[in-house]
Amino acid sequence: MNNRIIYVVSDSVGETAELVVKAALSQFNGSADDTHVRRIPYVEDIGTINEVISLAKADGGIICFTLVVPEIREYLIAEAEKANVLYYDIIGPLIDKMETAYGLTAKYEPGRVRQLDEDYFKKVEAIEFAVKYDDGRDPRGILKADIVLIGVSRTSKTPLSQYLAHKRLKVANVPIVPEVDPPEELFNVDPKKCIGLKISPDKLNHIRKERLKSLGLNDKAIYANINRIKEELEYFEKIVDRIGCQVVDVSNKAVEETANIIHHLKTKNI
């Protein structure tokens, strides 16, 4: 295997194919040092394939490839066999077996692994954003967010932020309390990005009483006082009017239902 070249051909980045090739090379003592792995990514035309086959024929190289488009894959195999060039299809046979096993047809779209990776990292980024800018912790997040949720205590701001983060939306939430002026950023944000979470006084009274009980506290505390709750909700309405944002009533809705409404509003406003 001295001075051998292995051509790694892919219709995407080619990382998968290169890792497989290097894993195989590691089984031959010292051979990896004498073998050059040359990656050729984003191959989408037969012209590039012809060039690679010519190079491999000239220097006795091997072609290893991950090509998912059937026409391109079949062309490489046919031309390599005509030229007596060694080749190995890394992904094709596995896709064929999976089609048989699942009774489904593959999408045959190059780069789907990278698309999935990007989707995953966007989701992680959104979740981290929701944690960082939860409960008005840092008002700078308001202007960076895709969605800003506002509401009095116990209107599901935090669980909604996390749920929407799993849809790759960056969400900041801000508590509305009569004794505390909302951050100025809240009045500078695009009103279409802001959603007010409305709730009926009786429903909120019940939720807060149950919350106090779960903490082993007296449910007669001011936190669950109906007059105090009405005062908070009146203040909330004033802030909503000042911002000019949309409102979603969360009184009798599950988090998932409210999140889907908010997601729909966000999509409609794009």
Swiss-Prot record:
Domain of life: Bacteria
InterPro entries according to UniProt: Kinase-pyrophosphorylase, PPDK_reg
EC number of this enzyme: 2.7.11.32, 2.7.4.27
Induction, as annotated: Constitutively expressed.
Catalytic activity: N(tele)-phospho-L-histidyl/L-threonyl-[pyruvate, phosphate dikinase] + ADP = N(tele)-phospho-L-histidyl/O-phospho-L-threonyl-[pyruvate, phosphate dikinase] + AMP + H(+); N(tele)-phospho-L-histidyl/O-phospho-L-threonyl-[pyruvate, phosphate dikinase] + phosphate + H(+) = N(tele)-phospho-L-histidyl/L-threonyl-[pyruvate, phosphate dikinase] + diphosphate
Phenotype of the disrupted gene, per the record: Lowers the level of gapB and pckA transcription threefold under both glycolytic and gluconeogenic conditions.
Gene Ontology molecular functions: ADP binding; ATP binding; phosphotransferase activity, phosphate group as acceptor; protein serine/threonine kinase activity
Annotated signal sequence range: none
Annotated function: Bifunctional serine/threonine kinase and phosphorylase involved in the regulation of the pyruvate, phosphate dikinase (PPDK) by catalyzing its phosphorylation/dephosphorylation.
UniProt-listed NCBIfam families: PRK05339.1
Record's protein name: Putative pyruvate, phosphate dikinase regulatory protein
Gene transcribed to yield this protein: yqfL
